[in-house]
Regions:
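Rossmann-like dinucleotide/flavin-binding elements
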Residues: 1-28
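Internal, well-ordered alpha-helical segments in soluble enzyme and binding-protein domains
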Residues: 3, 15-18, 44, 48, ...
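C-terminal helical "tail/cap" subdomain of flavin- and related membrane-associated enzymes
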Residues: 112-230
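Conserved anion/nucleotide-ligand pocket segment
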Residues: 27-29, 36-37
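Short acidic (Asp/Glu) and glycine-rich catalytic loops that position anionic groups and cofactors
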Residues: 27, 88-92, 131-136
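FAD/FMN-dependent oxidoreductases across multiple families
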Residues: 7-13, 35-113
Length: 230
């Protein structure tokens, strides 16, 4: 299997492939990109053909099945409680990890939290708390992808080269230890990520101050976030 293969033209966006073989001559090939503009079907098929030929030496192939979609990649807050008896879940409930688009493990953890809330409180409105550390890291990576997309591929290459896969998977699943997080952060290009981290912190502090001021004027506190959507 191939995980996040960046050997494809980035063209001003973050683009990579996944390859999951089922047999010697059959595989699932997924093309992922973080962008504001959706590709046409022709552009997607051309990128797939170019990748298979230049990276894997496959000039002729047949597509057996295909699917596509677009996910919201943003760190903006999602309203979860939509009424007295309605709780947003899944994509609508902001269960997609902002910086990667991964959702399966987050949905499972959220489902467990909903069950615990029902058993303990008689309602589902005590969901799993969002780890502030991961949300800040998501915001940093989103800012890097938006402002320095060409630097993402070498940064991820360094991260994969300097960390065991088990640590990376724990990090992506938001199950990492403090040492895991520090090790991964240390493996990334310091000038870019430290600078972006400081910019992100300043932006969040500034947005929070404006939100508190609006809250005083309107009698409520408004959440604020910056991000990029796909």
């Amino acid at each position: 299997a191939t995980f996040m293969d960046f050997r494809t033209p980035q063209d001003g966006a973050v683009r990579f492939f996944y390859v999951l073989p089922f047999a010697d001559n059959q595989a699932l090939v997924e093309y992922t990109l973080f962008t504001d503009a959706r590709l046409t079907r022709q552009e997607t098929e051309q990128a797939l053909a170019t990748y298979l030929q230049t990276v894997h030496g496959v000039a002729e192939f047949r597509i057996l099945e295909e699917e596509g979609g677009c996910l919201p990649i943003t760190d903006a807050p999602f309203a979860r409680r939509l009424g007295k008896r309605v709780l947003a879940i899944g994509v609508r409930g902001g269960r997609i990890k902002p910086s990667t688009g991964y959702a399966f493990s987050r949905v499972q953890a959220d489902s467990d939290a909903i069950v615990r809330s029902l058993l303990a409180c008689g309602h589902p409105f005590e969901p799993l708390a969002e780890p502030a550390c991961y949300r800040w890291l998501d915001a940093v990576l989103l800012r890097v992808m938006r402002t320095h997309s060409a630097a993402v591929a070498p940064a991820f290459a360094a991260m994969f080269d300097r960390n065991p896969m088990s640590r990376i998977l724990r990090f992506l699943d938001e199950q990492a230890t403090a040492l895991d997080i520090l090790s991964i952060m240390a493996s990334l290009p310091a000038p870019l990520f430290v600078g972006t981290a400081l910019q992100t912190a300043a932006a969040q502090i500034g947005a929070g101050g404006k939100a508190r001021q609006r809250g005083k004027q309107r009698g409520s506190r408004q959440p604020a976030a910056t991000g990029m959507s796909q």
